[in-house]
């Protein structure tokens, strides 16, 4: 279910402050965050945000195509190692 339009997008207030600080100073410092639920706004474009995936911080460079998506979408939490295959498959 989508978020109500009258509420607007959720962005963690500390993350918003850090991005604004980076933009006004002209720095490109990496911003670390645990807020995977924060929506990417146009202010974030051009910034690198390190999003926590439960184990480590995954750097995400924000482009215009990412606006409107959530940060967690670009930092996978599960690593798929493949299904178990049959041993000696095809050998006779």
UniProtKB/Swiss-Prot annotation:
Function comment: Protein S19 forms a complex with S13 that binds strongly to the 16S ribosomal RNA.
Family: Belongs to the universal ribosomal protein uS19 family.
InterPro entries in alphabetical order: Ribosomal_uS19, Ribosomal_uS19_bac-type, Ribosomal_uS19_CS, Ribosomal_uS19_SF
Region: Disordered, residue numbers: 73-92
Disulfide bonds: none
Short name of one Pfam family: Ribosomal_S19
Gene Ontology MF terms in the entry: rRNA binding; structural constituent of ribosome
Encoding gene (name): rpsS
Keywords recorded for this protein, A-Z: Ribonucleoprotein, Ribosomal protein, RNA-binding, rRNA-binding
GO biological-process terms attached to the record: ribosomal small subunit assembly; translation
Protein name, UniProt field: Small ribosomal subunit protein uS19
Biased composition (Basic residues): 80-92
GO cellular component: cytoplasm; small ribosomal subunit
Superkingdom as given in the UniProt entry: Bacteria
The UniProt record lists the keyword Secreted: no
The organism's taxonomic lineage, starting at the top: Bacteria, Pseudomonadati, Bacteroidota, Flavobacteriia, Flavobacteriales
The keyword rRNA-binding is annotated on this UniProt entry: yes
């Amino acid at each position: 279910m989508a978020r109500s339009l009258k509420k607007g997008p959720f962005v963690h207030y500390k993350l918003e402050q850090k991005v604004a600080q980076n933009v006004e100073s002209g720095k490109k410092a990496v911003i670390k965050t645990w807020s995977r639920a924060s929506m990417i706004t146009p202010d974030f474009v051009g910034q690198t945000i390190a999003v926590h995936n439960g184990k480590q911080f995954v750097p995400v460079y924000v482009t215009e195509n990412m606006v409107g998506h959530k940060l967690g979408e670009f930092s996978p939490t599960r690593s798929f190692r493949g299904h178990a295959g049959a041993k000696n498959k095809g050998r006779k």
